[in-house]
């Protein structure tokens, strides 16, 4: 590790201290009126009203403070956890849905007047891969396991105060496919001349465009390197876009406020909790979409995602209800537990049938943003070739799209892990003028003879700007190695099959070799996931006209589908 890089730079989390850096002001205790001297003068700062309500500091307050909390894992885990899921399921009954003759579902009038909720969930492919590796099952069977647990009769619906479960469980890959197309369009616009751009300069990121789907990377950039913020992609992550899509569509189709749609996201990392807590990812951006339907039942903002739990917390959630995940039926749910989405086109879009094609290993384990950008530009340049050059380690890879004549058409890169991100940030950092005596100076400029010193970093600074796009992820190895994934130690305890975890039967602490083997096992499950070839729907260019028509007056640009 470089001497410039300290251990503190690799961890952006600071544990909350005993005293908050921005404490709530408290007034001195009011003395009893009997003991006061009637002629005594009391200053204003010693007067305290009776029966003051207790002071409260929310998660949003902590994150906005930027003082003692950065990634705020301790606070996030306590506020967004399996306990929050159980408390919500027990606090609100599930909204009963009835099907009309023409197909769409609507809630009963009695239920709409009560406190019932529509429970929906979204699951990332990395979560399914982790479960598949843990229990020695296929990725498809892991999907069945999650569906049975969240929506089936032997899962969450088998217990709790109201027997509530999740009406729909959505794969985040669906919205990811839409974001892949939008990412390629965004990069394409930045490469055009300003006069030829269809999007205004203010809404476009600077080159190179940096991916914005990883909240750990975003938190790090905001806290320590704000100069890279103009380079961040303007697109939402699949988690946030899925929440926006579900809440807007269900609210409009069922005639309920978005606040009555409760969205749980199951993700591979804890920082996704931080993302869900951001003020920007609320109904502020999409509230005008639901004309006529009351947006909220209070003045509180409606979040895209109400709660995030990780893969490990999913195991804890099952354990809290006394449910063993491996004992659940590894088959699709009965039709009575899988209601159609309130629109046939959207139902086919969200719950598309899968075939046996595999995901490309070239796309990586973090969504394939960079891979899709490269393939899109290669398709626009017939005969071109993608040349790969590995960096100092496997988490740094540079890509060049070469013309048939050997000329570079575009460059892109992948940077995973904070150690490598430090090097990327150093390349993007603006050159700083050196004020040291004896520094080299350039020749006099055309405007005069004033001599300017040259920064010693000027040669390397800005060398990363020749990239068109950079896929940046905080976790080494990508999202399958997220901090919330099932660890090899957890897999030993959770597994009930002797074949589920190979070569790790020794109960001692796993060696680095065993940890790498375990990550490779999760990656194998991820890449073997059955994807839908026709699922590329018409996402290669734009959302289908039929989808636009079904969404009617909804502004697709507001939810990232255009």
Swiss-Prot record:
UniProt cross-references to InterPro entries, sorted A to Z: Cytosolic_Fe-S_CAF, Fe_hydrogenase, Fe_hydrogenase_lsu_C
Compositionally biased residues, Polar residues: 29-40, 452-462, 494-505
GO biological process, one term: iron-sulfur cluster assembly
Binding-site positions, [4Fe-4S] cluster 1: 20, 62, 65, 68
Top-rank taxon: Eukaryota
Chain segments carrying region Disordered: 28-47, 439-462, 492-513, 541-562
Binding site for [4Fe-4S] cluster 2: 214, 269, 475, 479
Example GO molecular function: 4 iron, 4 sulfur cluster binding
Cysteines paired by S-S bonds: none
Keyword set, alphabetical order: 4Fe-4S, Iron, Iron-sulfur, Metal-binding
PANTHER family linked: NITRATE, FORMATE, IRON DEHYDROGENASE
Family as reported in the entry's similarity comment: Belongs to the NARF family.
Protein's UniProt name: Cytosolic Fe-S cluster assembly factor nar1
The species this protein was found in: Aspergillus flavus (strain ATCC 200026 / FGSC A1120 / IAM 13836 / NRRL 3357 / JCM 12722 / SRRC 167)
């Amino acid at each position: 590790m470089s001497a410039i890089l300290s251990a503190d730079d690799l961890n952006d989390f600071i544990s909350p201290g005993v005293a908050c850096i921005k404490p709530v002001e408290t007034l001195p205790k009011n003395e009893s009126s009997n003991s006061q001297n009637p002629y005594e003068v009391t200053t204003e700062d010693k007067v305290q009203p009776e029966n003051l309500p207790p002071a409260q500091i929310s998660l949003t307050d902590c994150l906005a403070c930027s003082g003692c909390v950065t990634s705020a894992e301790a606070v996030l885990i306590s506020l967004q956890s399996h306990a929050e899921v159980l408390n919500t399921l027990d606090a609100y009954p599930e909204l009963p849905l009835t099907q009309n003759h023409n197909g769409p579902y609507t809630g009963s009038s009695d239920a709409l007047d009560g406190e019932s909720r529509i429970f929906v969930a979204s699951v990332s492919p990395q979560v399914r891969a982790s479960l598949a590796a843990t229990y020695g099952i296929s990725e498809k069977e892991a999907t069945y396991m999650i569906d049975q647990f969240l929506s089936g009769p032997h899962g969450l619906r088998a217990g709790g105060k109201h027997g509530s479960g999740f009406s729909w469980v959505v794969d985040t890959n669906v919205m990811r496919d839409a974001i892949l197309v939008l990412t390629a369009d965004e990069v394409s616009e930045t490469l055009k001349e300003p006069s030829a751009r269809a999007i205004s300069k203010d809404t476009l990121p600077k080159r190179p465009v940096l991916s914005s789907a990883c909240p750990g990377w975003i938190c790090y950039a905001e806290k320590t390197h704000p100069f890279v913020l103009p380079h961040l992609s303007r697109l939402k992550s699949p988690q946030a876009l899925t929440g926006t899509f579900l809440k807007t569509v269900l609210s409009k189709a069922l005639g309920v406020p978005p606040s009555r749609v409760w969205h749980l996201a199951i993700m591979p990392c804890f920082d996704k909790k931080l993302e869900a807590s951001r003020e920007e990812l609320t109904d502020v951006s999409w509230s005008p979409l639901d004309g006529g339907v009351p947006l909220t039942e209070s003045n509180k903002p409606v979040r895209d995602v109400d709660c995030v739990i990780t893969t490990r917390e999913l195991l804890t959630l099952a354990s809290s209800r006394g449910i063993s995940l491996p004992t659940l039926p590894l088959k699709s749910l009965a039709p009575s537990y899988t209601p159609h989405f309130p629109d046939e086109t959207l139902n086919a879009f969200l719950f598309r049938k899968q075939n046996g094609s595999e995901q490309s290993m070239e796309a990586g384990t973090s969504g394939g943003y960079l891979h899709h950008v490269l393939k899109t530009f290669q398709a626009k340049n017939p005969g071109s070739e993608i040349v790969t050059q590995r960096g100092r380690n496997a988490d740094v890879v540079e890509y060049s799209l070469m013309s048939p004549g050997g000329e570079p058409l575009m460059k892109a890169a992948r940077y995973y892990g904070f150690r490598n991100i430090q090097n990327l940030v150093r390349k993007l950092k603006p050159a700083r003028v050196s004020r040291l005596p004896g520094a080299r100076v350039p020749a006099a400029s055309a405007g005069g003879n004033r001599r300017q010193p040259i920064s010693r970093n000027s040669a390397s600074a800005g060398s990363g700007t020749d990239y068109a796009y950079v896929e940046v992820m905080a976790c080494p190895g990508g999202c399958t190695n997220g901090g919330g994934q099932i660890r090899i130690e957890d897999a030993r305890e959770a597994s009930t099959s002797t074949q589920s975890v190979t070569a790790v039967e020794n109960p001692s602490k796993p060696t680095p070799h065993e940890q790498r083997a375990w990550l490779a096992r999760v990656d194998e499950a991820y890449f073997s996931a059955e994807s839908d070839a026709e699922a590329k729907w018409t996402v290669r260019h734009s959302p289908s006209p039929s989808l636009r028509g079904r969404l009617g007056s909804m502004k697709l640009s507001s939810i990232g589908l255009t």
